Amino acid sequence: MYWLLRIGVAIEYLGHGWAGLSRSRAWLPYYDLFGISPEAAVDYLMYLTGAVDITVGLLVLFFPLRIVLLHATVWGVFTALLRPAVGEGWWEFLERGGNYGMPLALLVLVGGGGWSLRRWFTRADAPTAVSDRAHVASHWAARGGLALLLIGHGGFAAFENKAYFYKYFAFFGLDRGTVDAANLMTILGWFEILLGVAVLIRATAPLLWFVLAWKLLTELLRPLTGQEIFQFVERDGDYVLPIALVLGAGVYALARDRLRQSRPTT
């Protein structure tokens, strides 16, 4: 699970950095929020943002300092919060659940850094021993992130009628009139929302494998319908988290049961 999360976080940041170097116009409102002009954003700051994100991805992959994992988590939350801050809605924040849930799960798994500043600047290599509390907390960070991204993506369809969803349906030969007449957008949205709730309630292996297949299909529709490939790459948490939860299920169950047994009885 450690290496899966580590590689996943690295790819997430490499993909996000790629978007910055590509000077994605979708980022302009986020810079405008801080009074930065479109010209300055496109000519300078997008390159800087992209370069920093790529550096973070490479550091996580080759030299994973704990402080870098903390940055990855905080930056994931911050960039996700920018979406509702510029009026894009809270579903956007939820849909980025993998962007902050995945690095948080990794940070918790390696034990964080505690109150020691020096420890934060040490490598977060694969731990030889992980406490039961850390196993359980890491599991829930990953599970919560996966549930949120499913619920957020479902909200796009059920409540916001995102225009690019019609392109997804068109890819399968369904025009807008058919989609609206059959309420397919609402059905799809609520299906994903309920899928996210199901992950929170009982994350069984069959459910998680289905979620993996579902997210691979729905996110591959982005490049297949004309969106930039980095939109698929930077959402690798959508695919890494269900695998991580399946692989770590046994360890999580043992840790959870030991913690329950250690609680004092009244």
For each predicted feature, which ranges?
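Extended, low-polarity transmembrane helix blocks
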Residues: M1-R25, E39-V56, L61-K162, T178-L194, ...
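Perimembrane loop-to-helix junctions flanking transmembrane segments
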Residues: L28-V42, Y168-V179
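Functional cleft and adjacent loop/helix regions within the main domain
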Residues: F165
